[in-house]
Amino acid sequence: MSEPETARPSKVRRRFLGGLVGLWAAGVPAKAQPQSAGTGEARLPEYACAQNHQSLKQSSYDRTGGNADRWPLAPGETKEVFNANGPGIISHIWFTIAAPSSYHLKEIVLRMYWDGNSKPSVETPVGDFFGLNLGQYNVYQSAFLNCSSIKALNCYFAMPFRKSARITVTNEGAQNVGAFYSNIDYQLVSSLPERSLYFHAQYRQATPNRAVTFSSADKELNPDGKENYVYMETKGSGHLMGVTLGVLQNAERWMGEGDEMVFVDDDSKPVITGTGSEDYFCGAWDFGGRDGAIPFAHLYNGAHLMASAERIGGRYCLYRWHSDNPITFRKSLKHTMEHGHANNRADCFYSVAYWYQSEPYADFPTLPPVAERTPIIKLS
């Protein structure tokens, strides 16, 4: 994919990324202004002002001029779907995939590298990255991720890079991927604000979680969260933007009585403690319970998949965005959640955490093999 050697002279608008890059992607209503004539500049939304960046796209289009606008992926093959020199900002990613394997969303791995780093800042199965954490398509909409009809995957997180950006996909499955379509929109700019941070996304799973048993004397207390499920853990400074979570139930009854606990800057006690899993995802009362659960998908929170709720084999796909109040850290961050009250359940969890931070960052856990990533009921 060819690109200009130098971007056209431009000046990065201070508000373009700001301190919270994700807020730019979601859009924030303009605040009320004093009732004075003024120049009108403060009343104008950003999109009505002159734009100084260079708009570009890299895609899977047919270089011959034909209509074969896709890439096949053989088993074990890695395809570079994006490579650009900076400074720049990826503003939108769109994929759609045609593959015979029922779990190709779990088998294809997405990785992103910033500024020549050999370690990926994003490493996750492609479906999980787009909020399809159980490996099956489900149409939904949110501020930063969506799945459009019928199998279109979209991401609107802003991803700044100073020197370079590189994105790959790897087919770790046993079958050919017949067609991988890609469109990645980005902008070249003359410079980025000093406070611009790098986008990260980390996959984790517990298949299953280990249930903690208590004697009657313990009264099922969990003040320190030591056995909690861990969404992400990192060193450095930055802020958490949110998580997606898939749950496969291995037992009857409500699976979401666990509280979130967030540990900031090496604190041994959680700085943030919630009141239940459905509360963290901004729902309530067991999402409607065994016979009343109704899927929902809003800008900043959702449970876009709920099937066989509160039963063995029950399936949930959930998301929560913290763009209204990103969880900041200066030294470290560990985001966790109980699996059932005081970790008394052994359901399967599959999650991705999304955040921005400075470099360097802590190493990611080793990505589990495909067989372990595929959702399977595991009865105790």
Where are these regions (language model features)?
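N-terminal secretory signal peptides
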Residues: M1-K11, L20-A26
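Helix N-cap and loop-to-helix transition residues
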Residues: V12-R13, P125
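Boundary at the C-terminal end of the N-terminal hydrophobic targeting segment
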Residues: A30-P34
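Domain-scale selection of a single, long terminal region
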Residues: F16-L17
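Beta-strand-centric surfaces of beta-sandwich/beta-rich domains
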Residues: Q35-S380
